[in-house]
Amino acid sequence: MLKYIIPTIMLMPLTWMSKNSMIWTNTTAHSLLISLTSLLLLNQFNDNSLNFSPMFFSDPLSTPLLILTMWLLPLMLMASQSHLLKEPPTRKKLFITMLITLQTFLIMTFSAMELILFYILFEATLIPTLIIITRWGNQTERLNAGLYFLFYTLMGSLPLLVALIYIQNITGSLNFLMLQYWTQAVSNSWSNVFLWLACMMAFMVKMPLYGLHLWLPKAHVEAPIAGSMVLAAILLKLGGYGMLRITTILNPLTEMMAYPFIMLSLWGMIMTSSICLRQTDLKSLIAYSSVSHMALVIVAILIQTPWSYMGATALMIAHGLTSSMLFCLANSNYERIHSRTMILARGLQTLLPLMAAWWLLASLTNLALPPTINLVGELLVIMSSFSWSNITIILMGTNIMITTLYSLYMLTTTQRGKYTHHINNITPSFTRENALMALHILPLLLLSLNPKIILGPLY
């Protein structure tokens, strides 16, 4: 794993030593190189000894998430350029350094071998994200959003630390590969119920579970574009990854404890989708749609069948690319119109025809149109939940319908209709923006040709 961690760290001196005119070019080009080399990880499924050490390892579950993490850094740099146009060079370099630090922490989190190391890095990702939101956010409420983000996540993950120390005392090891062979079944005594809740809560807050999701719309709306992208695409997946890793250890307790959480997720999925239909703020709509998609992932992970695990990993990757692309599109609107209100940004299809094509593609992938991998993930989750309980098909069907409705509502509000008079003189879309959208949509389309590489360890 060091062949990805060290080049990423070396991007920092590159940033600070670059000429002011070359800051963006250098960092974007080199981070793109790193992300292209990360594709080599896909080859190593059969022979994992190649990327295996006492500290870091990668397996078919973490590999797609690692590649997604590395793929996103150049995209974040490309998206942030006009946001930081008026800042002095030192601040630009500081911003890029924050992104690189976050990237390094994330790579190490997804490949951590020990649960305590995973926990430390899981918490370390908070710091750069918080600085990005509170320093480079758009509105004055960004400090409030940062506080929400910090305290929700910290309150969730303190019990996890206690639980991990307790598991360490019982088993003598917190190694992921060792814990799989922990043969003693976890009985359903009261103390073990609390142990399960402590282990799960941190990841449930991060996902976020409906009811613990209030930090997410706030953080998304106030964050700068890079913050929104990394939050939607990767930080939410940390919760899913942690749950996938830890539920297998806590069997058979999970089977008993999962019921209330599955019910809450199914209810929250419908509720947040319905909230999307009434949103006026574009970023807020995309944030709530993230909550409803992640609720599906929570359901899939808690059902614990091979199909649902495959569906969860596929959905996480698909949602990461889709929501990141939607945030980029919302940001390109915001940079031209200086408002996130959807009513003010209507009728843009006549002014920016190519952008309208990207909007159409992004909305269609968001509503899981065949043949995208969003559909693959959703189908696997729906089938596994149907075999778990037949009634869920009604809820899933309702959710699909509402998702389609709000995706098309978002598309028609921003692109169709008579455009308002205050947007007569907007700049056309840049090549940079078109390249950014293409780099989001290409993986989505190419993965639909071979979805098995993102279906996780059970395929």
Swiss-Prot record:
Keywords: Electron transport, Membrane, Mitochondrion, Mitochondrion inner membrane, NAD, Respiratory chain, Translocase, Transmembrane, Transmembrane helix, Transport, Ubiquinone. It is found in: Mitochondrion inner membrane. It is a multi-pass membrane protein. The chain crosses the membrane at residues 22-42, 60-80, 92-112, 113-133, 147-167, 193-213, 224-244, 257-277, 284-303, 308-330, 351-371, 391-411. One of its GO terms (molecular function) is ubiquinone binding. Core subunit of the mitochondrial membrane respiratory chain NADH dehydrogenase (Complex I) which catalyzes electron transfer from NADH through the respiratory chain, using ubiquinone as an electron acceptor. Essential for the catalytic activity and assembly of complex I. Belongs to the complex I subunit 4 family. This is NADH-ubiquinone oxidoreductase chain 4. It comes from Hippopotamus amphibius (Hippopotamus). The gene is MT-ND4.
